Amino acid sequence: MECLFPVVQDEENAGVRTLFNRPCGYCEACRLTYRQTWAARIQLEAQCHAENIFVTLTYDQDHLPDPPQLVPDHLSAFVKRLRARFAPLQFRFFACGEYGSRTLRPHYHVVLFGLPCNAEVERQVLSAWGAGHVSISQLSPARASYVAKYVCKDISDDDKLPEGYQREFARMSRNPGNWCWFYRSCSGCG
């Protein structure tokens, strides 16, 4: 989808002045393109691993934050605990925190690259979460697209949130980063 409000870029290189349009990065079309790019990156990352899972983490009533909002540190701590349980095996992840559409109840979706969908992994994920319910399934293109939408700020309906609540967010593994394997495998790259 083409940018709805392209920005004119004026560039001079070796004495030659060039004017060209670049995407604004803010309009709905740009955010949709960005989301689609991240969904593709998640799918490419998934191709690097034999198995990948999609996990949903929800709070039970005893562990629901007060006020009931997303807590990014809960997600970070979960990933750290899970890494400790699976060491020395390393895995990568892409995660988002969102609110339920009807109840605004906070929960998290996590794509775990390199982990199989089996009872032992489910047991370890449940133990590492420790704050409520867990569901695990195979990663699909639709699920990759679903979590990718949270990389776009302001694409969700944040005006429905009470003032001061944590906004919906995305977090992912860093270094070497998604697509690194693709870059290295290209002829003539790096």
Regions found by a protein language model. Name each.
Residues 101-106, 112-190:
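Conserved His + Asp/Glu catalytic blocks
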Residues 24, 37, 75, 118-122, ...:
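Alpha-helix initiation and N-capping motif
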Residues 33-103:
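Signature for HUH/AEP ssDNA processing cores
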Residues 23-26, 51-53, 143:
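A generic secondary-structure signal marking the coil-to-beta-strand transition
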